[in-house]
C-alpha cells in the first residue's frame, strides 16, 4: 500500500494553519484523477525493493519521508491525514462509547481529499467539512461507496482500507487545546474543536476503527509517563526474551541477563479504585464488585478442578482470582461480542446476571477462537498457574537463558514422541504468557556492550531495563509499540463486528526525538528488521507503508528522492538532488533548508575574521588595531576550527593580516613559534597513543 497524497482545497484557519491549497504528495507522485487514468507514479519504480531486506516482510513495504523547517506545515499535514481518517471512521462505524471503549467525534473545518493505494487499486476519501465520501477503484467502476448503518453493511469497505499507527512523543504536539479559539476579552474558550483527538488515543476497541495514536494523551495533550513506562517494560521484556530464545538481539548491543519479579500486595485495592473511577458513568461501584465476584467465583471453580493448585497465602490467592474476574469484566466492557452476552450496554443490576451467562463468557474467553490479544493477559495468568509459580511472597531473580530453557522443557514434556521438540519461541504471545502477570513488580537486567575507547574492544556492562537512558528508552519504546500493534492486528479474526485489516500505515512524527546520531542512522534498518521478526503472515498483512517526519539527515539518507515530500512555508516544493546514501553534510544543506552548514556563533566568529581580511587594504589602520587588540583570541579561534580546509583558509588570512605590520625578522619569529606549537601538539598525541597501547 501507499499513502499517495492529499489534495487540500481549503478549511478553517485553525485547522489548515499555514498550509496553502494544493497537492501534497508523499513522494514524487501525481494526483490520480480520471484525466490521467488514475496513474500516480512513474512506471518502473523500484523504490520498494530497497526495503525487502528480510524474507518474512510483507510483499510490499514502502518508506517515505516528510521534510521541512520548523513551521513549514509538516505536523499540520499529518493532522489533516488523521482528521480525514477519523471522519471516515466516525461515519462508517457505530459510535457506541460503551462498546468500543472510545467515542469518535467528527472533526469539521477541512476541505480535502486523501488518496491511497492498496493491492494495486487507487482509493480516496473526500472530506468537505461535514460531508464524507469514499471511493475505491478506477475508471468505469470508480463510484462513491455509500457509508451506511449498520456496520455489517459497511465493514466490507474496510477490507480494502488500511490501519494507521502513529507515534509522536513531542510534549507540544496533538494538544486538544491548540484547536480551540480563545476570547481575549473574557479569557474563555469559544469552542472545543480539539475533542476529536480523544478518540484516536484509545486503543481498546479491538482494532475496529482504522487508526490509533501513541502514546496515549490525556486532556491537554498530557502523557502519563509512568503508565507508558510500565506498559513499555512489559512489551520490552517479552521481546528481549523472544529474540533471546532465537539467539538474536532485539536491539544490537543489548541482551537479557536476568528477570526479576516481586508480588504486589496492594494490586487489588489500587486497581479496583482506579477502575471504579473510570467506569463510574457506566457501572455503579456495587455492580463492579458484584460482576467481578461472579466472574472470580467461576474462575476459582475452574482453577481448583483443572489446575489442582492451591496457595498457602490468602492474599496471593485473592489477588489472582480478583485479577481474572477484573480482566473478564474489562473484556465485556470493551468488546461487543462479549458484552452483549450480559447486555452490558444497558446493564443496571448485577443481581440479574445468571450463572449461564457467566459460564458462556468465560468459556468464550477460553476458546481457541479467542486466543488473541483480547484474552492474552487472562491466558498469561492461567499459564502462570499451570507452571506452578506459587512461591511468590519473596522477590525472585532468574537467569534469562535458564528461564527460557525451563519453559521450553515444560512445554516439551507434553509432546508426543512423534512431535518435534521446541527449541525456541516463535511469537510474541508465546513469550508474553510466560511472564509474571501484572500483579507483580517486574524488571529485567540487560547486558549492554560499551565501547570504552577507539583503541579498545567493547566490553559488557549490566544495566536494568528501568535504568536505560531516555534515548535508549525512546528507541525501544517506539519500536516495541509498532511490533505490539502489528502482532495484535494480525491476530484479529473476522466476525459480524470486526473486519481484519490487511494493510498497515506506520507514521513516525519527529522520529529522531531523543536519538543519538547512531540511533538515527540505523532507525530505518532496525525498524525493518524488527518488523521481519514479527513473523508476519503475508496472507493476513499484505503491505506496510511507513511515513517518517524527520529533521535527521541520517534518516533521509536511507530514502530515495522519489519518496520524499518537501515543505517550505506551507507549500510543497521540489528538490532535484538525490538523497539515498548521500553525504550527510550535503543533505543537511541541500534538503533541510539550512542557510549555513555550521552553528551561528561559529559563523559569526569566522565572518568577523573574513570581513577584517576583506577590508585590510581600504582600512589598514583599523585592521592593525583589531589584530593588536585580539591577537591571542584569533590564534585561539584558528586552533579550534575542526574543518581542515576552513582551518587552512583562516590560517592563510590571519598570516596575511599579521604581515601588514611585520618586519621580515618578526615574520620568521612568528612562523617559528607556530611550528614549535605544532610539534608540541604532535608530541602530546604520540604520548597519548603510547599510553593507550600499554594499557
Predicted regions and their residues:
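Conserved small-residue
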Residues: 14-26, 30-32, 37-52, 56, ...
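Intrinsically disordered or highly flexible coil/loop and linker segments, enriched in small
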Residues: 171, 222, 474, 491, ...
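Short alpha-helical "patches" and their helix-cap loops
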Residues: 98-101, 106, 492-503, 600-617, ...
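Switch/communication elements of ASCE P-loop NTPase nucleotide-binding domains
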Residues: 6-86, 446-591
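C-terminal lobe/lid and adjacent interdomain/linker elements of RecA-like ASCE P-loop ATPase modules
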Residues: 522-667, 672, 677, 683
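Short, flexible/disordered secondary-structure transition segments
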Residues: 91-92, 224, 489-493, 534, ...
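Short alpha-helical segments and helix-capping/turn motifs at coil-helix boundaries
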Residues: 93, 99, 195-200, 550-551
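Coupling/switch/interface segments within P-loop NTPase motor domains and analogous charged loops
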Residues: 2-5, 105-109, 115-460, 612-695
Amino acid at each position: 500500500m501507499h499513502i499517495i497524497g492529499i489534495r487540500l482545497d481549503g478549511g478553517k484557519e485553525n485547522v489548515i494553519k499555514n498550509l496553502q491549497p494544493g497537492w501534497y504528495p508523499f513522494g514524487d507522485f501525481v494526483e490520480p484523477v480520471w484525466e490521467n487514468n488514475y496513474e500516480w507514479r512513474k512506471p518502473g519504480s523500484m523504490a520498494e525493493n530497497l526495503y525487502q531486506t528480510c524474507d518474512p516482510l510483507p510483499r510490499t513495504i514502502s518508506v517515505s519521508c516528510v521534510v521541512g523547517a520548523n513551521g513549514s506545515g509538516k505536523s499540520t499535514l499529518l493532522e489533516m491525514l488523521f482528521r480525514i481518517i477519523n471522519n471516515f471512521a466516525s461515519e462508517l462505524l457505530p459510535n457506541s462509547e460503551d462498546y468500543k471503549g472510545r467515542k469518535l467525534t467528527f472533526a469539521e473545518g477541512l476541505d480535502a481529499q486523501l488518496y491511497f493505494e492498496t493491492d494495486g487499486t487507487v482509493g480516496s476519501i473526500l472530506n468537505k467539512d461535514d460531508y464524507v465520501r469514499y471511493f475505491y477503484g478506477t475508471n468505469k467502476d470508480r463510484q462513491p461507496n455509500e457509508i451506511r448503518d449498520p456496520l455489517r453493511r459497511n465493514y466490507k469497505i474496510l477490507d480494502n482500507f488500511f490501519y494507521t499507527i502513529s507515534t509522536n512523543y513531542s510534549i507540544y504536539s496533538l494538544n486538544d487545546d491548540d484547536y480551540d479559539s480563545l476570547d481575549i476579552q473574557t479569557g474563555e474558550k469559544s469552542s472545543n474543536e480539539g475533542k476529536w483527538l480523544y478518540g484516536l488515543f484509545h486503543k481498546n476497541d479491538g482494532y475496529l476503527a482504522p487508526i490509533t495514536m501513541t502514546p496515549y494523551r490525556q486532556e491537554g495533550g498530557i502523557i502519563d509517563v509512568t503508565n507508558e513506562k510500565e506498559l513499555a517494560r512489559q512489551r520490552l521484556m517479552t521481546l528481549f526474551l523472544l529474540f533471546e530464545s532465537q539467539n538474536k538481539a532485539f536491539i544490537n548491543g543489548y541482551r537479557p541477563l536476568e528477570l526479576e519479579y516481586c508480588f504486589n500486595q496492594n494490586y487489588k485495592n489500587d486497581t479496583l479504585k482506579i477502575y471504579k473511577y473510570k467506569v463510574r458513568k457506566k457501572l455503579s461501584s456495587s455492580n463492579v464488585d458484584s460482576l467481578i465476584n461472579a466472574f472470580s467465583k467461576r474462575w476459582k471453580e475452574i482453577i481448583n478442578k483443572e489446575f489442582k493448585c492451591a496457595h498457602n497465602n490468602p492474599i496471593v490467592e485473592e489477588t489472582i482470582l480478583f485479577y481474572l474476574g477484573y480482566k473478564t469484566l474489562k473484556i465485556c466492557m470493551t468488546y461487543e461480542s462479549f458484552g452483549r452476552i450480559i447486555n452490558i450496554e444497558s446493564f443496571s443490576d448485577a443481581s440479574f446476571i445468571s450463572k449461564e451467562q457467566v459460564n458462556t463468557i468465560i468459556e468464550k474467553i477460553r476458546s481457541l477462537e479467542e486466543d488473541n490479544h483480547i484474552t492474552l493477559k487472562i491466558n498469561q495468568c492461567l499459564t502462570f498457574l499451570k507452571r506452578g509459580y506459587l512461591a511468590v511472597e519473596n522477590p525472585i531473580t532468574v537467569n534469562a537463558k535458564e528461564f527460557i530453557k525451563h519453559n521450553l522443557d515444560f512445554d516439551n514434556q507434553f509432546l508426543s514422541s512423534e512431535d518435534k521438540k521446541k527449541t525456541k519461541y516463535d511469537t510474541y504471545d508465546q513469550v508474553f504468557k510466560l511472564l509474571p502477570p501484572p500483579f507483580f513488580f517486574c524488571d529485567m537486567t540487560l547486558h549492554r556492550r560499551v565501547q570504552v575507547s577507539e583503541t579498545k574492544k567493547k566490553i559488557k556492562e549490566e544495566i536494568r531495563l528501568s535504568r536505560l537512558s531516555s534515548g535508549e528508552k525512546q528507541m525501544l519504546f517506539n519500536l516495541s509499540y509498532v511490533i505490539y500493534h502489528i502482532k495484535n492486528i494480525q491476530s484479529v479474526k473476522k466476525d459480524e463486528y470486526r473486519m481484519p485489516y490487511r494493510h498497515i500505515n506506520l507514521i513516525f512524527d519527529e522520529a529522531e526525538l531523543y536519538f543519538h546520531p547512531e540511533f538515527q542512522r540505523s532507525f530505518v534498518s532496525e525498524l525493518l528488521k524488527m518488523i521481519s521478526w514479527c513473523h508476519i503472515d503475508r496472507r493476513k498483512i499484505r503491505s506496510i507503508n511507513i511515513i517518517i517526519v524527520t529533521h535527521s539527515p541520517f534518516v533521509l539518507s536511507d530514502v530515495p528522492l522519489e519518496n520524499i515530500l518537501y515543505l517550505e512555508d506551507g507549500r510543497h516544493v521540489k528538490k532535484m538532488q538525490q538523497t539515498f546514501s548521500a553525504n550527510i553534510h550535503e543533505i543537511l544543506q541541500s534538503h533541510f533548508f539550512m542557510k549555513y552548514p555550521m552553528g551561528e556563533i561559529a559563523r559569526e566568529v569566522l565572518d568577523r575574521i573574513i570581513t577584517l581580511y576583506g577590508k585590510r587594504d581600504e582600512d589598514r589602520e583599523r585592521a592593525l588595531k583589531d589584530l593588536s587588540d585580539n591577537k591571542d583570541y584569533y590564534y585561539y579561534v584558528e586552533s579550534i576550527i575542526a574543518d581542515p580546509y576552513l582551518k587552512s583558509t583562516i590560517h592563510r588570512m590571519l598570516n596575511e593580516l599579521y604581515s601588514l605590520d611585520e618586519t621580515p625578522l618578526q615574520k620568521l619569529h612568528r612562523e617559528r613559534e607556530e611550528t614549535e606549537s605544532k610539534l608540541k601538539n604532535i608530541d602530546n598525541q604520540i604520548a597519548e597513543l603510547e599510553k593507550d597501547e600499554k594499557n
